[in-house]
Each structure stands twice: as C-alpha cells, then as structure tokens.
Amino acid sequence: VDWYPWGEEALQKALQEDKPILVSIGYAACHWCHVMERESFEDEATARVMNEHFINIKIDREERPDLDHIYMDALQAMTGAGGWPLNVFLTPDKRPFYGGTYFPPVKAYNRPSWKEVLLALSQAFKERRNDIEEQAATLTSHLSQSNQFGTQSESLVHIPREELFTRAQCDTIYQNILSQADKVWGGFGRAPKFPGTFSIQYLLRYHHSFDAPDALKQALLSLDKMIQGGIYDQLGGGFARYSTDEQWLAPHFEKMLYDNALLIDVLSEAYQLTRNEIYSQTITDTLAFIEREMMHTAGGFYSALDADSEGVEGKFYTWSYEEVQLVLGDKAPLFCECYDVTEHGNWEETNILWLRHPVKEFAAMKKIDAAALEQLLAGCRQQLMETRAPRIRPGLDDKILLGWNALMIHACCKAYAALGNEHYLTLATRAMEFCWQHLRQPENGQGFYHTWKNGQAKYPAFLDDCAFLIRALIALQEVSGNLDWLTRARELTEFVTEQFSDESGTYFYYTQLGQKDVIVRKKEIYDGAVPSGNAVMAANLRYLALVYDQRQWASRAQDMLARLSQTVVRYPTSFGVWAGELLQMVKGTHEIAVVGKDYLTRMRQVHDYYVPFKVLLGNEKDCPGLPLLEQREQAEKTLIYLCQDYHCIKPVNYIQEIVNLLK
C-alpha cells in the first residue's frame, strides 16, 4: 500500500485529486492490526484497489491520540462499537463518512471482506456523493456536540463546596462501583476484564475515609487475583493489558507502560494501608521489569511490548508441560501443581503460569512450610526465567511518550513513598530530566512535544501529556523536597490555562490553540485506560491553588467537578479519577508543611503512613511566595505544621504527633 503519514502532502493530494481518504489507525502492540496488515495490506491485489481509489494514511494512535479520539468517536456514532485497527473513510476535506475495525480478506464473521468494502465505498463516493456529504456533515456536527456530554452548562462556582459535594454522593459512587464488582475473582464487569485501577483506588480511599471493610475487601481481592493471575507475568514481573476471561488467567499479552504505572500507583497505596508484603514484592518485581525491558539508557521509558513473538500470541510467556519437567526435574511436580501446568495445557494446548491459590493457602493444603515452599518456588521461577531469556522476544515499541512517561514518573514517586527505596526516586528524577531535555519545545516557552524516538521529538503535546507531567512534578516535589519541581508545575499550569482552555474558561480542549490539521477540538472527560486530562487538571489546579493561594484555580477545579458531578455519581467506573476528586472534596485536604534542618527526614516519615488527601511541602528555611512555608522557621527546630481549610493547628516536633492528629 502506498501509505502516507497524516500531513499536508496527503491531505492536499486528496483535495487535488478529489479522492476519498482511508485512514487506518493502529498501534504497535495491537494483535488484530498485525493480522489485517498481513492478510490485506500486504496482499498485492488488495493494495492495488486501495492505491487506485483512495489516498491511504496510516496513523499510530499513540503518536496522534487527538486524531484517534476524533475518528473513534465518529466510528462509535456510526456503529455503536469501537476498537483497533480503526479504519475510517473521510471526504477529501477530512470529514468521516464510514468506518469499521477489523475486516477479513474474505467474507466471514458476518463481516464483508475488506475488498468488498473498498469497492462499495469507492462506487458510492462517485455515484452517491450527495449522500456521502450529508453523512459527513451529520457526523462532524455530532463530534462538536459530543463535547457537551454529561456537563451542566451553568457555572456552580457560587454554591458552597459542602452543598455541591456530599457524603451521600460518595456512598452512591461506592454502591455503584460495588454493583459492578466481581465478588469471586475481583475486578469489575465481565470478560474481557481490565484492571480497573481507578475504581480500586476509590475503594481504598473510601474505606480509609469512612471505615468501610467491604470496600477494602473488594479492592484487595481485585489486586490479589490479578497478582495471582496470568495477567501478571509470574516470572518476569509486569502486567499485561487485560484478561480475556473472568479469572485473570489468559491475558492479551501486550504489556503497556501506562497500565503498569497505574497499577504501581494503586499497589503503593494498598501497601501503605495494609503493609502486605505481596504488594511490595509485586511493586519491586514490576519496576525491575520496567527498568530491564522498557527503559532507554538515558532514563526515558518506552511505550509497550507486543503480544506476539514469531507471529504467535503469548509464545514468549507460555510453557509446555515437558519443558517445565525438563528444566525443573524433581521440583517440577510441586511447581506444576502450584502454577496449574498440565500435560494438555490450561490455554490453547499450552500453559500460562498462574496461581490457582495463594502460596500460603497452597502450602496449608499440602501440609508443608509456607516459607520453605516460597523459597523453592522462587528458585524454580529463576530457573524458568533463565530458560525463557534466549527465546525470541516480543516486539518493543520504543517511542517515548511524554504523558505515559509522566505516569511512570508518578508511579516511581509513589513506590518510593511506600517502600523507601532510594533507587525509585533516582528513576523518577532521571526520567523527568529526560523529558525536560528531550521533549521541551525551546521555541515555545513552556511548551512540550508529545513523542520522542531516535533523537527526534515531534507533535505538540496534548492536554493529558501536560496534565500528567504537572501531576508528576507535584509528586516529585513531595518525595524529594525539591521546590524547583513545584515551580515548574506552576509554570506549566499557566501554559495549559493559556493554550488549552475552552471558551467558558471551565474545561480544557485536548489540543493546543492553533492546531490546524484537526476538524474539531475535542474535550476528553472520560477516564479510559489512562486518566482524563481534564480530571487530572482539576486535581492539579486544586493542589496548586492551596500551595500558591490561587483562589481562581480552586474555583475552576470546583466548577469542573460540580458540572460533572451527577454523571460521575451515576457512572463512576467511567469517571474514576473524577470520583476520587469528589471524595477528596468531601473529606478535605491535609496541608502538611515541614520547616527546619531535618525537613527531608520528617517528609520521608510522613510517607510511612497512608494519607491519600494531602499537600506536602518542606524546606530548611521560610519560603516567601509559598504561604504554607512563610513565617514558619524557628531556630534549631524542625517543626511540622498541619492545616486544613485555612486553619492551622499548633506546630509539633514529631511525626507521631501529626499521625495522631490525622487520625
């Protein structure tokens, strides 16, 4: 196929030749994208039809998420479904009129063949152009209107916070999440099952706020079952994108940077709350995997590992019964029973390693010592890991995306806060410095690029890139005590409010001002696989408003949430980050300031406790311009100040005194 990148050359050619545009959107770790490439795009006869009748454009959805959002929204409006590969047909002026996902090379699965679709659309474009233009106009109008979904139009900024956000709303969110929860296998909804990290995090925080044991039970069940499942790489660490079954046995084997970052976030909170070493070990092993397989030598993080190797999904990760016997010898029977390895296989005639029962439970069933069993299993896992290492590896998508890197930086900060391992702070700092060095736009003040690869950065950053980066800068200050990160967060927030704000000054567009190659500026408010940029910006504005006493930022954050609150309460699994914001609005934020020569030690001690809703600042001396750190200094003392809602209590010397006050 004569593929073009999305750009001026292809778009002008479509206008000059008056040809429809075929846009195929996929991503490197997408199994069905590879299948369609192999079956259709690499077939000469099919390629001839595509080249003759269409201007063909291929887009990596991770490089251009703005275009993916627009055309996926159009596909869902047309068909009620979505997914990748996303194949969408446009008029020469970029407006969508038809689309679909995977099409087979011959008619099958109740789908027409790809060639049939191409020829029918080419004929329709020539013979029924008016119908096509009408459909394109309708869809484009829908795309503009979809920005309004779920939001109330009038500003609610004048209503007191305690009237807008209530305990009753938090309770309803909890009940709505629980109504979708799988009480046996954890997680939410039916297969395919995604991790649901935002809902798990809400349950942890709801329990911490209101002492709700059932919320904690469901959150921990979800984490435990994923950690025991095939969705988690039992040998090498790291989580796959989702499970194809309700038991978390058979994953779709691609490993994404963002999933692992978000799971490290929530595992860190679970560890702070429970001190369960299974969570600390999973964090340790997952970050070891990230560092070993998904990190550039200069410190940035790669995007994804493919599901396939040698053209077979999961081949790198699965085992035959005979292989395990050969490697482990007399230890094999016990290992195979524990990890469900059988002669006939537990998935497509091969075996995915997973724990049907937790190790301690299995030890009790077998009447053997749990510590001795864990030691034996650890040795077995190491032997199998060494045996697996020379296999042909899944493909690596080595793009370095600003937003996903920011998610992993945030995760490293959370892991450092929870476990105290200095190496995680080093990883976070190096990755942030990588972003600052390689993804900044020197010609655009505070601007950034979206993606970097092989020394080249491209595409202006999108809202979620900037929102996640601000959040990561805030987290980095909280664990390092370096206030420079906070200054950068404030400057980037000012840039975002200038470049991304909508006309009402409430929400933010996904793209910056002046981007000419999109047919509509979308506003993304759902929390999908990654958080909504708007939800994270609301949290950033609320945090920085407290730090810098910026009342207008606090008002905007409140208004963003208030206009959405009814929708958030009804659909919390689609608005999980917003739901967490609502809970924080109800509970309030602890503002903790530490001033004195031992401030870093005291800040470190704060992280030993689970305090999910906090602002934490520290410095050796007073800091003019930061109200929480003004007029706090006392000679030879390190003092800890606790404030909430513009009211502070008497400073204390020791962290235990603060912990008692927080309780």
Feature annotation, model-predicted:
Residues E386, P390, K414-A418, F434-Q441, ...:
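Conserved helix-loop functional segments at active or binding sites
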